[in-house]
């Protein structure tokens, strides 16, 4: 069936008076029950007609509209599903939930797992940052929006419903809300994404697209017989109803306000205006008319940058009868107000659902939104904190979040301080860049933000002030977000076997304490020995592999490594190998197995303790379980205090002392998600319909590792080290069981050794060390004082030996000193008005310092020295320092200095 046939096959439309027409403006087909309609009604073909003229029979608030929609589909046999987090924990390819169908990808849509209900309805908060730069400007764009949806998952021989029923539901819903059939347009717009495609109808009312009805029945294939957007597709066995109804757009259409922002969070908009430098009343009739006209024209003009934006503003100004300057005095501040209102709602969902701001991954997107909001607040001279607006959104929405508002507030306060530090440092950084480059390109601005966190507007402003050629690139924030919106694929090393083998029966799943077993050799390839069944654990999930022996025919074969490839366990055997068909006895090193088990179970206990002490935003970011220690990386916005670390360790050991049972079972994926939530996926997302769920005390995770039978078998847990390994990620290094005892014994040995060296009892070590430290600081101060005295004396001696150039003292010397002494001496000489260079031999290199107490730039002189002596450096105008390969003597230095002074004279 061709795409045209797919649309013509929707008999509901023809049976209910809808006629298929082609729009003369865009050339696309649409369906209408209005015999007079010739244009599709979709901007830019036609402007909004609902602004000032609501299309529903009554105005709705967000919660009212959401409930109305969900109830509508519940009454028609759909199971109501609770919203998923905006942080897509169940996905390995994307960070944020971008559509309601994303909740059910990849396992439900591929048919691997059943849907939580079929059919189902949901109102899913989604975050899309593709149009970040358009938010506030067009009147319709949002970073966070709720996609109300109903889905039906159809399988061969089991159809729930398809195109006719879907269009009928949409028409009935709109009719109930007060929209006449003649006012509904269904525009044909084939959909494609993520390797799938299908026919799609966009529901348009009053010029506003309120719903998208996708009929996903195609999969990408090079020999497919249907082409959509340049790719070829073929029919797939499963076919899915994938709809999206914009909650905010429904509310906007019901109110007919100038912008969507005025409809969905007017209280936040008013609060920002009342506490900012905005000097006009949003409810003023002239202001409302200007904003309404801007929204209408923005709808038909598309991208609003540069000349198109100027055209929009001139058109609106002419229509309303004001100057462009007067119009911009209203529109530009309002765009910032609307953007800030939108962004703070998005931040609430990001942080509330557990994102921790950082410089990488999903945390990058949270920080991007926060810093953009802080910049907007500065420009508006906002007399409130971002948290005040976030809290307002929470009250309006009434949603419950995993992360309490107190934690959200703490994160925002920390981010504000970090932003201020970045801005203060960034100013000089941009100035230095402008000194080197007279024109800043888009890539320069992206680099300044990505590497240094400097807001684009700030960089553009500073560069322009310094006379550089620069302009604000279009959609730069959207591009920044896009670069970081998808998780990087980790390239795993693929093991290729010559033959095919059945999946190994993995005995360690059922009994991790099993240390001996019987098996048969079914393959030998190189160093790999393949058995039909095995209790040897392969390296996986951050847990090191088992080691041990295979015993056969009186021989002993050492297993030094264990790997897995496509479900087949590969035993790396050192030396000779048992032959295929041999019956073997596997013997696992019990010490290695138990240490790994204790460390793995302890990892779960530690994670639980971290979440209890630090909060629900804590999420596993990596883990490693080895023989002598383990590590756990978690998301957190600052390094925990010593008191918090002590509390975490104490709680973990209480969990261990409580000797709670450790249980594991294979569960249906959807059932496990429903029962335990997405915290299951702390250690990653395992594939398949069924997943192994491990419960360690009060911690529950999808996990394929080996574990103790109870928390008591862990023995004890000792935190060895806590450090921040990157912004927003904290690493806990720890040991459990015997490894913990060994770690404590090593600490005690070091204490005894330190006590012996200082000749005091261990209990007196802190005071003794403190006393020595204070004495050392006093001596250090005295040394620094003496160095200054020496530098002064040395400077006087060198000034007496100085040459003269145009009545200036020129100093050039090779001295015996370290870099710190060189710099101090150079500062003294510069203070005395001298110009020159000092060199000193270092380990494997030569230190060089240039100085100028005159109009000349020491950095430029350093570059000249560097050309001759092969090196480089940097510094201030009065003193610069670096390293070179060649040690110049006094005469050689003077030659360079005199040449430099002559060239720069006047």
Swiss-Prot record:
Cofactor: Zn(2+)
Localization (cell): Cytoplasm
Catalyses which reaction(s): tRNA(Ala) + L-alanine + ATP = L-alanyl-tRNA(Ala) + AMP + diphosphate
Lineage: Archaea, Methanobacteriati, Methanobacteriota, Archaeoglobi, Archaeoglobales
GO cellular component: cytoplasm
Cross-referenced Pfam families: DHHA1, tRNA-synt_2c, tRNA_SAD
Alphabetized GO MF terms: alanine-tRNA ligase activity; aminoacyl-tRNA deacylase activity; ATP binding; identical protein binding; tRNA binding; zinc ion binding
Principal subcellular localisation of the protein: cytoplasm
Protein keywords: Aminoacyl-tRNA synthetase, ATP-binding, Cytoplasm, Ligase, Metal-binding, Nucleotide-binding, Protein biosynthesis, RNA-binding, tRNA-binding, Zinc
Subunit structure comment from the entry: Homodimer.
Cofactor note: Binds 1 zinc ion per subunit.
CDD domains: AlaRS_core
Keyword Aminoacyl-tRNA synthetase tagged: yes
Function: Catalyzes the attachment of alanine to tRNA(Ala) in a two-step reaction: alanine is first activated by ATP to form Ala-AMP and then transferred to the acceptor end of tRNA(Ala). Incorrectly charged aminoacyl-tRNA(Ala) is also edited in situ by the editing domain.
Top-level enzyme category: ligase
Assigned protein family: Belongs to the class-II aminoacyl-tRNA synthetase family.
BP terms from Gene Ontology: alanyl-tRNA aminoacylation
Residues bound to Zn(2+): 600, 604, 703, 707
UniProt domain comment: Consists of three domains; the N-terminal catalytic domain, the editing domain and the C-terminal C-Ala domain. The editing domain removes incorrectly charged amino acids, while the C-Ala domain, along with tRNA(Ala), serves as a bridge to cooperatively bring together the editing and aminoacylation centers thus stimulating deacylation of misacylated tRNAs.
Effect caused by changing residue 703 to A: Loss of tRNA editing activity
Protein name, as recorded: Alanine--tRNA ligase
Annotated source species: Archaeoglobus fulgidus (strain ATCC 49558 / DSM 4304 / JCM 9628 / NBRC 100126 / VC-16)
């Amino acid at each position: 069936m061709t795409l045209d046939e797919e649309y013509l096959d929707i008999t509901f439309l023809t049976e209910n008076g809808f006629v298929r027409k082609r729009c003369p403006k865009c050339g696309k087909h649409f369906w209408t029950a209005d015999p007079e309609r010739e244009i599709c009604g979709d901007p830019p073909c036609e402007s909004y007609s609902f602004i000032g003229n609501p299309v529903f029979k009554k105005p709705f608030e967000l919660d009212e509209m959401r409930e109305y929609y969900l109830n509508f589909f519940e009454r028609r046999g759909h199971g109501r599903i609770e919203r998923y987090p905006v942080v897509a924990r169940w996905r390995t390819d994307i960070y944020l939930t971008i559509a309601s169908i994303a909740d059910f990808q990849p396992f439900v849509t591929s048919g691997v797992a059943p849907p939580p209900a079929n059919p189902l309805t949901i109102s899913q908060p989604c975050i899309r940052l593709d149009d970040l730069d358009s938010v506030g400007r067009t009147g319709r764009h949002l970073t966070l929006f709720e996609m109300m949806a109903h889905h039906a998952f159809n399988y061969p021989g089991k159809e729930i419903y398809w195109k006719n029923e879907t269009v009928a539901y949409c028409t009935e819903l709109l009719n109930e809300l007060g929209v006449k059939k003649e006012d509904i347009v269904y525009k044909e717009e084939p959909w494609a994404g993520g390797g799938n495609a299908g026919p799609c109808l966009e529901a348009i009312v009053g010029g506003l697209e309120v719903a998208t009805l996708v009929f996903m029945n195609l999969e990408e294939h090079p020999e497919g017989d249907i082409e959509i957007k340049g790719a070829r597709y073929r029919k797939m066995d499963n076919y899915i109803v994938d709809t999206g109804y914009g909650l905010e757009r429904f509310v906007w259409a019901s109110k007919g306000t100038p912008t969507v922002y005025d409809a969905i969070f007017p209280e936040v908009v008013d609060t920002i205006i009342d506490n900012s430098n905005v000097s006009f009343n949003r409810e003023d009739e002239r202001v409302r008319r200007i904003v309404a006209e801007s929204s209408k024209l923005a709808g038909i003009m598309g991208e609003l940058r540069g000349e198109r934006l100027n055209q929009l503003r001139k058109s609106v100004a002419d229509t309303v009868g004001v100057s462009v300057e007067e119009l911009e005095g209203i529109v530009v501040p309002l765009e910032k107000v609307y953007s800030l209102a939108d962004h703070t709602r998005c931040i609430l969902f990001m942080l509330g659902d557990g994102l921790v701001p950082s410089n990488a991954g999903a945390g990058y997107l949270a920080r991007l939104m926060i810093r953009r909001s802080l910049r907007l607040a500065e420009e508006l001279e906002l007399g409130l904190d971002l948290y005040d607006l976030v809290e307002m959104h929470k009250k309006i929405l009434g949603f419950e979040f995993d992360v309490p508002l107190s934690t959200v507030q703490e994160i925002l306060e920390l981010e504000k301080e970090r932003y201020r530090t970045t801005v203060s440092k960034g100013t000089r950084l941009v100035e230095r860049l402008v000194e080197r480059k007279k024109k800043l390109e888009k890539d320069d601005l992206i680099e300044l933000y990505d590497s240094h966190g400097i807001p684009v507007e700030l960089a553009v402003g500073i560069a322009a002030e310094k006379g550089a050629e620069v302009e604000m690139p279009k959609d730069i924030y959207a591009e920044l977000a896009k670069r970081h919106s998808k998780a990087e694929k980790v390239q795993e090393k693929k093991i290729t076997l010559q033959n095919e083998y059945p999946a190994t029966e993995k005995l360690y799943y059922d009994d991790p304490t099993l240390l001996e077993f019987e098996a048969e050799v079914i393959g030998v390839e190189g160093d790999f020995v393949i058995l039909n069944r095995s209790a040897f654990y392969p390296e996986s999930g951050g847990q090191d592999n088992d080691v041990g022996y295979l015993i056969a025919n009186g021989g002993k074969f050492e297993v030094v490594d264990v790997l897995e490839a496509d479900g087949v366990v590969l035993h790396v055997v050192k030396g000779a190998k048992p032959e295929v068909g041999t019956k073997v006895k596997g013997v696992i090193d019990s010490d290695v197995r138990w240490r790994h088990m204790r460390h793995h179970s302890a990892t779960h206990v530690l994670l639980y303790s971290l979440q209890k002490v630090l909060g629900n935003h804590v999420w596993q970011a990596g883990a490693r379980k080895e023989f002598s220690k383990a590590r756990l990386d978690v998301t957190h916005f600052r390094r925990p205090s010593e008191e918090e670390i002590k509390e975490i360790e104490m709680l973990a050991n209480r969990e261990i002392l409580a000797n709670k049972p450790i249980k594991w079972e294979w569960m249906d994926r959807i059932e496990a998600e429903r029962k335990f939530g997405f915290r299951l996926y702390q250690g990653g997302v395992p594939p398949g319909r069924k997943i192994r769920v491990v419960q360690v005390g009060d911690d529950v995770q999808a996990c394929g590792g080996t574990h103790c039978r109870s928390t008591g078998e862990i023995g004890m847990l000792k935190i060895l080290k806590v450090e921040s390994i990157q912004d927003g990620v904290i690493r806990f290094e720890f040991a459990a069981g015997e490894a913990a005892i060994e770690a404590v014994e090593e600490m005690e040995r070091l204490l005894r050794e330190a006590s012996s060296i200082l000749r005091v009892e261990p209990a007196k070590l802190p005071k003794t060390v403190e006393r020595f430290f204070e004495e050392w600081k006093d001596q250090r101060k005295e040394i620094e004082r003496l160095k200054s005295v020496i530098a002064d004396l040395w400077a006087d001696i060198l000034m007496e030996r100085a040459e003269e150039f145009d009545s200036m003292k020129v100093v050039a010397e090779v001295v015996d000193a370290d870099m710190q002494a060189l710099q101090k001496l150079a500062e003294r000489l510069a203070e005395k008005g001298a110009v020159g260079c000092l060199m000193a031999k270092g380990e494997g290199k030569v230190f060089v310092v240039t100085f100028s107490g005159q109009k000349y730039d020491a950095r430029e002189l350093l570059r000249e020295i560097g050309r001759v002596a092969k090196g480089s450096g940097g510094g201030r105008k009065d003193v610069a320092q670096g390293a070179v390969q060649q040690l110049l003597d006094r005469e050689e230095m003077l030659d360079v200095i005199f040449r430099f002074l002559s060239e720069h004279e006047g």
